[in-house]
């Protein structure tokens, strides 16, 4: 059966339908609101277009989707499956489409730094990136049951092997900081971009990529390199990169053929969220528990009437 993908993770927010000539106040300005269109555009999905007339003229477009529809999927698209790829939305859809999926609604999510999305990114259950806790960035995640989870996720990683014992990885695909331990996957680029200090060791996946749920296994393919930096990332593999002695010493013991196991845990408001399949970041939150939040001053560009 042909499945229908609801692209990205944010467009499912519902809004109150405006009655003809209703009055709205937006950023202190009053508008007359008329509904120009309200029609079905896909399975379980309607498009609403509103016309706001006042001192300024505004046009509002939004979709409302019933995620319980059995042929609607929630899917994150990240460029050309590379964190640093800069593509338009039509290009992203073209590169990620196939005969089994038709993309019909979506929204541009997260903001980009030079190293890709700021927030945690999960695509088809594979971890593309985790956000540093210092960013205070929010994310919306979808689990296997198509339940949405909004907030500031805290992600931890347990790495184990018979050679190193148990270790705690700090992040995935972020620039390495001091006293750090980062996993770099091929979604980050061709190499880690790290400086010469530290230890790095490459591995390839045994049973798929770095999964957002469960344990992923990787096989070490080369001897650890010390004080070299910028190690090449194998296709379909990872590089373990550390520059603190308590991480470096165990990594230096790894041998070719050793198996390392990596298990992530996603925590939201102190509770573990299981079976995450998709996630994308953004800031700030604008709607929570059915209430519009007063967050338009948190980022300077939000005070304007248009992005």
Q: Where in the sequence are the language-model features?
A:
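Extracytoplasmic/secreted cell-surface and envelope-processing proteins
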Residues: 114-119, 150-151, 160, 245-248, ...
């Amino acid at each position: 059966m042909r499945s229908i993908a609801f692209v990205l993770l944010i467009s499912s927010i519902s809004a109150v339908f405006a009655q003809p000539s209703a009055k709205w106040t937006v950023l202190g300005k009053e508008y007359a609101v008329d509904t120009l269109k309200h029609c079905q555009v896909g399975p379980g999905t309607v498009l609403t277009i509103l016309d706001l007339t006042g001192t300024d003229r505004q046009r509002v477009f939004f979709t409302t989707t019933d995620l319980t529809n059995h042929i609607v999927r929630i899917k994150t698209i990240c460029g050309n499956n590379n964190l640093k790829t800069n593509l338009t939305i039509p290009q992203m859809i073209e590169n990620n489409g196939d005969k089994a999926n038709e993309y019909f609604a979506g929204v541009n999510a997260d903001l980009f730094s030079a190293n890709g999305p700021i927030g945690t990114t999960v695509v088809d259950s594979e971890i593309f990136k985790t956000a540093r806790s210092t960013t205070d960035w929010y994310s919306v995640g979808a689990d296997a049951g198509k339940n949405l989870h909004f907030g500031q996720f805290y992600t931890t990683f347990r790495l184990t092997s018979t050679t190193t014992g148990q270790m705690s990885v700090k992040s995935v695909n972020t620039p390495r900081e001091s006293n750090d331990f980062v996993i770099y996957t091929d979604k980050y680029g061709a190499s880690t971009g790290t400086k010469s200090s530290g230890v790095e060791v490459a591995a390839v996946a045994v049973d798929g990529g770095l999964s957002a749920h469960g344990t992923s296994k990787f096989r070490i393919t080369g001897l650890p390199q010390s004080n070299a930096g910028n190690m090449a990332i194998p296709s379909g593999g990872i590089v373990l990169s550390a520059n603190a002695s308590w991480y470096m010493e165990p990594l230096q013991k790894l041998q070719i053929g050793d198996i390392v196991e990596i298990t992530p845990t996603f925590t939201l408001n102190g509770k573990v969220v299981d079976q995450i399949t998709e996630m994308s970041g953004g800031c700030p939150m604008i709607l929570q528990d059915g209430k519009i939040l007063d967050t338009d001053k948190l980022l300077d560009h939000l005070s304007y009437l248009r992005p």
